[in-house]
Swiss-Prot record:
The gene is mtlA. This is PTS system mannitol-specific EIICBA component. It comes from Klebsiella pneumoniae. Its EC number is 2.7.1.197. Homodimer. Residues 378-473 form the PTS EIIB type-2 domain. The lineage of its organism: Bacteria, Pseudomonadati, Pseudomonadota, Gammaproteobacteria, Enterobacterales. The EIIC type-2 domain forms the PTS system translocation channel and contains the specific substrate-binding site. It is found in: Cell inner membrane.
Length: 635
């Protein structure tokens, strides 16, 4: 499937599911009422059972129609979409779920086109009159057309589809649907399939029979659970270690996207989920299982909650059978696999991520259209197809890392791709969804991943964000860190001379490097000997490492009286000296400072300006020429 076709299919499926998913609560309410109060329910009640008919006939289709119209034409589109949907409902003798999916967007489209046509042409003072009457008149016309045309046409289409379904069920062909459903799920079409196709068919069948098998074709957690169990027993590396947690999230939380990377890293496992899905559907067909309403999310808890009286054995058996077959097939595939390196899910995830980036001419760290500049990033969104389970978990992992890194000015949230706001700075999506996200918000930077719980990617991103923030804060950080070392009483300019530059130094520890800088300040007549200890004491409080291979040691506020005159020494350590707790916090340039006023600001400004050019830092760290140092710092 080409990239454009896949994106179009995903977008269409997402549009269908977007009409249903916001209203899932209403479907669940209807399902619970049906399961409890109909004559065959748990608590039969003739009076309360009267809610069932009007809800499925009017409430649910109207909600879908309103939502579909709103997706296309905003609030006015929702109103006209609902009016149009009413025409479809009255024009047919069956629940109009498919009809509402046509009528709602049609109403939204028509009012949107009208609004665009009259934009700027309405005289002042007549806006409300035109808006109200246009919606009413267009809604009336569309309702009549829907009543006369769309309703009867959809009724005929629904009967044809129902006949096809009945034929498949009668001839035991329904399990073949898994051949298409399971691979489509891996392409993130699971919500589109479940809510865009199976839910409308299932609601109609449930209204007639009290339950529907369609609600468990895609939502059955068995096939995915079988794959994860196989990883737990026969997998290798971090894939085996992480499969247990993924299984809990998948089976109890209903987030099916969690197992997709495990299949993607070993594509042969698609066979396992297909056979598992077919087994589950076959079991449901034989034992007459099904649900009264969509199970969303597709967890075992939601499935049991939507199971009608008398269908528990069938549904549980279908889940167990699907899980068992998927597990056995996966185990056989694992045992016959000779590709050991693919057992590590993080390695596989990173490999696919890097290969996708490299195929587009980008570096692995810049998948999508990420630049090296993350300094402006303030809003990060982890996006998936529905904007719920998988992206919410990914956002949770990244948010904790960002918060732990102290990046309080960066927000991390999750969203559906279609709802990405225009002010987002960085978008993180699954690699199969990145192109859609890039079309939705082309101005943002984008990162692709294959596993929303890829801790390694989030850690790498956080480190880059920290480095970018440190780069911005360098000058402020220097000034703030030195506020306790000088007062602002003089304006004389301090000039860095050749006697203050020491190249080719070596030191085993930062204490040794700080002591040398302090001793040179003493020899230069800038400070009293006690100032050296004050520099060591200051380092114990917080590291004076600024990043970009630079450290700026100086004394404590109590030692300012030990400063005789402002002085700066430039010490070069080509092999580096570790200044921070992290292994990469290594300083090659150690700038010792003693100041009572702001005479040193010229040198500090030159240093912080140099941070903007990595080549300058590299030259300062490697040069053997004092004159070159002076030239670079006195630009």
């Amino acid at each position: 499937m080409s990239s454009d076709i896949k994106i179009k299919v995903q977008s269409f499926g997402r549009f269908l599911s977007n009409m249903v998913m916001p209203n899932i609560g209403a479907f669940i309410a209807w399902g619970i009422i049906t399961a409890l109060f109909i004559p065959t329910g748990w608590l039969p009640n003739e009076t309360l059972a009267k809610l069932v008919g009007p809800m499925i006939t009017y409430l649910l289709p109207l909600l879908i129609g309103y939502t579909g119209g709103k997706l296309v034409g905003g609030e006015r589109g929702g109103v006209v979409g609902a009016i149009t949907t009413m025409g479809v409902i009255v024009g047919a003798d069956m629940p109009m779920f498919l009809g509402s999916m046509i009528a709602g967007p049609l109403g939204g489209y028509c009012i949107k086109k009208f609004d665009n046509w009259v934009d700027g042409k309405i005289k002042s003072g007549f806006e409300m009159l035109v808006n109200n009457f246009s919606a009413g008149i267009i809604g009336m016309i569309l309702a009549i057309l829907a009543f006369l045309g769309i309703g009867p046409a959809v009724e005929v289409l629904s009967k044809i589809l129902a006949a096809g379904v009945n034929f498949m069920v009668a001839h035991d062909m329904l399990p073949l649907a898994s051949i298409f459903v399971e691979p489509a799920k891996i392409l993130f079409l699971n919500n589109a399939i479940n809510h865009g196709i199976f839910s409308p068919l299932g609601i109609q069948q449930s209204h007639e029979l009290g339950k529907s098998i369609f609600f468990l074709i895609e939502a059955n957690p068995g096939p995915g659970m079988g794959v994860l169990l196989a990883y737990m027993f026969f997998g290798r590396g971090s894939a085996k270690q992480s499969a247990g947690g993924a299984a809990i999230i998948h089976f109890l939380g209903g987030i099916h996207e969690i197992y997709f990377p495990y299949v993607l890293m070993n594509p042969r496992l698609i066979l396992a989920v297909i056979l598992g899905g077919m087994t589950g559907v076959f079991t449901l067909t034989i034992l007459n299982g099904g649900l009264v309403s969509p199970a969303s999310p597709g967890s075992i808890l939601a499935v049991l909650a939507m199971t009608p009286k008398g269908a528990y054995f069938a549904n549980i058996a279908a889940i167990i059978a699907a899980m068992a077959v998927s597990f056995v097939v996966s185990a056989v595939l694992f045992k016959t696999s000779k590709v050991k390196e693919r057992s590590d899910i993080e390695a596989a995830t990173r490999r696919m991520h890097d290969m996708k980036a490299e195929s587009k001419g980008a570096s692995p760290l810049a998948a999508g259209n990420v630049t090296n500049d993350l300094s402006h990033v303030r809003k990060i969104i982890v996006a998936c197809d529905a904007g719920m389970g998988s992206s919410a978990m990914g956002a949770g992992v990244l948010r904790k890392k960002v918060q732990d890194a102290g990046l309080s000015n960066i927000s991390v949230t999750n969203s559906a791709i279609n709802n990405l706001p225009p002010d987002v700075d960085l978008v993180i999506t699954h690699r199969d969804l990145t192109e859609r996200a890039m079309r939705q918000v082309p101005q943002a930077q984008h990162i692709s991943l294959t596993n929303f719980l890829d801790s390694g990617l989030y850690t790498s991103l956080t480190e880059r964000l920290v480095a970018a923030q440190r780069h911005i804060d360098n000058e402020v950080k220097v000034t703030d860190s030195l506020k306790d070392s000088f007062d602002d009483t003089n304006n004389n300019l301090f000039q860095l001379g050749a006697d203050n530059i020491f190249l080719g130094r070596k030191a085993a520890t930062k204490e040794e490097a700080n002591s040398f800088a302090g001793e040179q300040l003493v020899k230069g007549g800038y400070v009293e000997p006690e100032y050296v200890q004050a520099m060591l004491d200051r380092e114990k409080l917080t590291s004076t490492y600024l990043g970009e291979s630079i450290a700026v040691p100086h004394g404590t506020i109590e030692a300012k009286d030990r400063v005789l005159k402002t002085g700066v020494v430039f010490c070069q350590y080509p092999e580096g000296v570790r200044f921070g707790e992290e292994e990469d916090e290594v300083a090659r340039l150690v700038i010792g400072i003693a100041a009572r006023n702001n005479e040193h600001i010229q040198v500090i400004t030159s240093l912080t300006n140099a941070l903007d050019d990595e080549t300058v830092i590299e030259r300062l760290a490697k040069t053997t020429s004092v004159d070159e140092v002076l030239a670079l710092l006195n630009k």
